[in-house]
């Protein structure tokens, strides 16, 4: 319950901050879903888990977004709050060899696992592939560090779709 409260407060803070941010080119909001695979390292009751995740967020600038995620796995659930930073510098190199629909990003934040109450910092990388201006495929790889727990690190990979509105 403590983990849920902490992550809930973090998520509410991110959404409140996003509501006061300067409006980017579009409305700035997005939502999506993904299939997710979690690979824990170290000793724990956690095992390899497959499941799904739902994400929602808002762009504060053209490069920076804040998002929240809720994941339901086989025997666990997770909540996360993170910042997503898009790497627009590659545009200087001819859109990465002509792939103008490809959009790489870095992410950093916190994730909590409900089965044992652990919360830890997370970092990752990923990419969008834009199908249209409103729809994109999203691929992520993330590592979450376990603090004060037997699980040292939890790796996750996900693939899904995202809608910008």
Segment roles from a protein language model:
Residues 130-134:
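A short, structured loop/turn motif at beta-sheet edges
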Residues 29, 50-52, 64, 79, ...:
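Hydrophobic core residues within well-ordered beta-strands of beta-rich domains
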Residues 42-48, 117-121, 149-155:
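Outer-membrane beta-barrel translocator domains and adjoining extracellular loop/strand segments
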Residues 1-27, 165:
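Cleavable N-terminal export/targeting peptides
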Residues 30-31, 80-87, 153-165:
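Outer-membrane beta-barrel "beta-signal"
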Residues 20-60, 64-66, 70, 110, ...:
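Short glycine/proline- and aromatic-enriched beta-strand/turn motifs that initiate or cap beta-hairpins
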Residues 140-142:
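C-terminal binding/interaction regions
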Residues 22, 58-124, 129, 163:
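Gram-negative (and chloroplast) outer-membrane scaffold detector with strong preference
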